[in-house]
From Swiss-Prot:
Known partners and oligomeric status: Monomer.
Name of this protein: Ribosomal RNA small subunit methyltransferase C
Summary of the function given for this chain in its UniProt record: Specifically methylates the guanine in position 1207 of 16S rRNA in the 30S particle.
Gene Ontology CC entries for this record: cytoplasm
UniProt-listed InterPro entries: DNA_methylase_N6_adenine_CS (IPR002052), Mtase_sm_N (IPR013675), rRNA_ssu_MeTfrase_C (IPR023543), RsmC/RlmG (IPR046977), SAM-dependent_MTases_sf (IPR029063), Small_mtfrase_dom (IPR007848)
Alphabetical UniProt keywords: Cytoplasm, Methyltransferase, rRNA processing, S-adenosyl-L-methionine, Transferase
GO MF annotations in UniProt: 16S rRNA (guanine(1207)-N(2))-methyltransferase activity; nucleic acid binding
The reaction(s) this protein catalyses: guanosine(1207) in 16S rRNA + S-adenosyl-L-methionine = N(2)-methylguanosine(1207) in 16S rRNA + S-adenosyl-L-homocysteine + H(+)
Enzyme class: transferase
Length: 347
C-alpha cells in the first residue's frame, strides 16, 4: 500500500521515463520499487531506519537502498548525478533546505526536482523555501490531500558540508556543562526540556553496558558520560539526523560511545546493565503507544540481573499501566506537573 504522497508521485510518473532517479526521505512503502516500471534505475535514501528496513529487502541491481543523512561514499566534488530527484517534504520543516541542497548536489544541470508532501505538513510554503539555484516551483498536482511541485536545477548549489547544518551550544545539566551539536530537523529547545531535566536530576549510578534509547542529539549520553565516564554506552535512534547529531555531540565533548540505528530494540544485541531513556512517546497516538509497549516489553527482556531501568514519561498518558504490567513492582522516583520518572531494578 502506497502512502498518499507516493500515490501522487505515481500519478505523475510519466516524467520519469528512463530516468536515473534518486528518492530522498522516502516513507514506509515501496514507491521506489514501483518507479522501476518507468525509471531506468532508482536509488533511495531513507532518513528513518524503519522506512529503510521496509524497502531494503526489495533492493536489486536497479534499486539501491540506503539509510543515513547522506548517500555513502560520495566524493564531495564528484557526487553521483541523477536526472530526477524526488524529495518527500519533511515533517520537521527546518530539514527541508538541507534536503534541497542535497538534491541539488546530485542533479544533472537542468535536472528535474519533484517535491511532494501532505497539505497540512508545510509544503504550501515550498515556493518560498526553494533556494535560488532552483527554478521557481510549479504546482503539478493536487490530490490525496497532498501537493506535488516541480522545479529544475538552474544554478550551482553550495557543496554539501554537514558542518553548515549544525548549531552548537553549551547546555548546563546537573552533571555539569556539556556541548550539544544539533543538526537541522532534530528536536532542540537549546535548554534542558522538563523531562530530560527530571531524569538527569535523579540519574542512578550505573556500571557496565548501558543503553540510551532514542538518543536524539546526545544530551543524556553526554551528561551520563560526564558523570560516569567508564560506562560502555550504546546510543540508538531511528532518525539519521539524530544519530549524526549524537556522534558530533560526543566528539565535541571528547567522549566515545557506540552509536547506531535501531527500530525499537530490534538491532540491539545481548543484555544491558542499564537502560536509560527519555523516549519519544509523548503524543498519545495509537501508533506511538504501540511503539512504547514494544519498547517496555523488549527492554524488560534485555535487562541483566541487577540491571537498572529508568525512563521519564508523560504523566498524562497510560505508560504507567504498560510499565507496571511488564515490570510489576516499580518506583516513581520523581515527578513534576508534566512527567513521571520510573525506576526498576531487575532482582
Amino acid at each position: 500500500m502506497l502512502t498518499n504522497p507516493s500515490q501522487v508521485i505515481i500519478r505523475n510518473q510519466d516524467s520519469l521515463s528512463q530516468h536515473k532517479v534518486l528518492v530522498l526521505n522516502h516513507e514506509a512503502d515501496l514507491l521506489p520499487k514501483a518507479l522501476l516500471d518507468v525509471a531506468a534505475s532508482v536509488d533511495a535514501l531513507a532518513l528513518d531506519y524503519h522506512h529503510y528496513l521496509h524497502l531494503a529487502p526489495h533492493a536489486n541491481t536497479k534499486l539501491r537502498c540506503y539509510f543515513g543523512h547522506d548517500l555513502p561514499h560520495q566524493d564531495p566534488l564528484e557526487r553521483e548525478k541523477y536526472d530526477t530527484v524526488i524529495v518527500y517534504f519533511p515533517k520537521a520543516k527546518p530539514l527541508a533546505p538541507y534536503l534541497f541542497n542535497l538534491a541539488a548536489n546530485h542533479l544533472v544541470p537542468n535536472g528535474q526536482l519533484l517535491v511532494v508532501g501532505e497539505n497540512k505538513g508545510g509544503i504550501k510554503s515550498l515556493v518560498k523555501l526553494l533556494p535560488e539555484y532552483f527554478a521557481t516551483g510549479m504546482k503539478l498536482d493536487n490530490a490525496r490531500h497532498c501537493l506535488l511541485f516541480g522545479s529544475s536545477l538552474e544554478g550551482s548549489a553550495p557543496a554539501m558540508k554537514l558542518s553548515d547544518w549544525v548549531s552548537q551550544y553549551q547546555l548546563t545539566t546537573p552533571q555539569g556543562e556539556i556541548s550539544i551539536c544539533n543538526l537541522v530537523g532534530v528536536f532542540s529547545e537549546k535548554r534542558l526540556d522538563l523531562g530530560t531535566e527530571l531524569l538527569l536530576s535523579h540519574l542512578p549510578t550505573l556500571s557496565g553496558r548501558v543503553l540510551d534509547f532514542g538518543c536524539g542529539a546526545g544530551v543524556i549520553a553526554a551528561a551520563l558520560l560526564k558523570a560516569q565516564p567508564s560506562l560502555s554506552l550504546e546510543c540508538v535512534d531511528i532518525n539519521a539526523m539524530a544519530l549524526a547529531s549524537c556522534e558530533l555531540t560526543l566528539a565535541a565533548n571528547g567522549m566515545t560511545a557506540k552509536v547506531y540505528p535501531s527500530d525499537g530494540l530490534a538491532q540491539t544485541t545481548g543484555k544491558f546493565n542499564g537502560i536509560i531513556s527519555n523516549p519519544p512517546f509523548h503524543d498519545g497516538l495509537a501508533s506511538t503507544t504501540s511503539i512504547a509497549q514494544n519498547f517496555v516489553t523488549d527492554s524488560a527482556k534485555q535487562l541483566q540481573h541487577n540491571g537498572i531501568w529508568q525512563i521519564v514519561a508523560n504523566r498524562h498518558l497510560p505508560y504507567s499501566d504498560i510499565i507496571a504490567a511488564e515490570f510489576g513492582q516499580l518506583k516513581v522516583v520523581a515527578d513534576n506537573n508534566k512527567y513521571k520518572l520510573y525506576y526498576f531494578q531487575h532482582k
